[in-house]
Every structure is written in structure tokens, then in C-alpha cells.
Amino acid sequence: SRVVWASSETTLGLPFDRQQPAYAPMDENHPLYPESSYALSKVLGEEMARQFNRWTGIPFIGLRFSNIMEPQDYAQFPTFWDDPMKRKWNLWGYVDARDVAQACRLGLQADINSAEVFIIAAADTIMNRPSRELLAEVFPNVPLHKEIGDFETLLSIDKARRMLGYNPQYSWRQYVGL
């Protein structure tokens, strides 16, 4: 048996109202800064998963979902573009609901025997501006942890790609004309 459950990007300190990210793209090693009872419950769930895995050997896969969107939600994205502050709260992240389903399936099939957490986000941001530009404007003191592509997510999905085979298939760019 194995457990796959929904954790949350909020474990990382989102929304970024009181502090800034330690670095970007944020990954699973980023310090945890739960800023709400919801986020704290997710952090505690992740710790319980580690302990239950240690006690029982049952694998636990926690999926730290970004802001889950459906295709009909993409029409609102252009309303965010005039002011990057509107969506800075989660580093302009999102994930398509169909990619959430993919991540759940991959978690169930993964050859993992430990307790692991994975950030699950789209490969891009919700913005029509380069990610590096957004970061420099809104979080000028946050260092880049690695090189990033023009519109690459600032919520790193590298671990999910590597360990789960996660490969986001959907982007708002397929639905909204630029």
C-alpha cells in the first residue's frame, strides 16, 4: 500500500505578505514558513507522513499543489498582467487540474518507499512577462538558485520531474491569445 495526498504550496510561506522567498525557484528544500492554520496543518501532515513511514514502511507521497486551475479559468489571466503584485503571493504559480490528476497517478505508481513531498505546478507562470523580470521587479533581493527559462515557473518542479516522471501537459498559453 501507499498514501498519496494533497499538501500545498502554502507550506513554503505563501502568500508572501510577511516575508520573501529565501530563493527562487523555490524547491522542496526551501525553508517552511506556514503563515496560516491551513498551511501549518499541511506541514504537520508532512511530518506525520515521515514518522508513519518510519514506523510502518508505508510510502507517503505529498503533493504540494500550486493554485489549481481549470481551462475556463484561463480567461481571467490577462486581468493579472497589468500589475505583477496581484499574483505575487504565490510567485505567479498555477497548475492545470488535468496535470494534478497526472501527478496523483504518478504518485500512486512511483517506485518510492520513503516519505517524499513534491511541488506540483505548471511549467510556466500565469504572467506574459519573463519570470526573471517579475522576480527582479517584485522581489529584487531574492537570489536565483538556478538559471530559468523565459516564462519558467518559480515553483521548481525538478524533483517531481526526476522522481515521478511528472511532465505538465497543459498551459494557459494553449487557450489564451497573446
Task: For each feature predicted by the language model, list its residue ranges.
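Conserved Rossmann-fold NAD(P)-dependent oxidoreductase catalytic core, especially the SDR/UDP-sugar
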Residues: S1-E35
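Short aromatic/basic micro-patch
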Residues: G62, Y94, L154-L155
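Conserved beta-loop-beta element that borders a ligand/cofactor-binding pocket
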Residues: S7, E46-P71
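Active-site helix of classical SDR
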Residues: S37, S41-L44
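Alpha-helical substrate-binding/gating segment
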Residues: I68-V117
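C-terminal substrate-binding subdomain of Rossmann-fold SDR/epimerase-dehydratase oxidoreductases
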Residues: R98-L178
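Short, flexible, mixed-charge acidic loops at enzyme active sites
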Residues: F16-A24, Y74-D82, E133-A136
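Catalytic tyrosine of NAD(P)H-dependent dehydrogenase/reductases that use a Tyr as the general acid/base
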Residues: Y23, Y38, W92
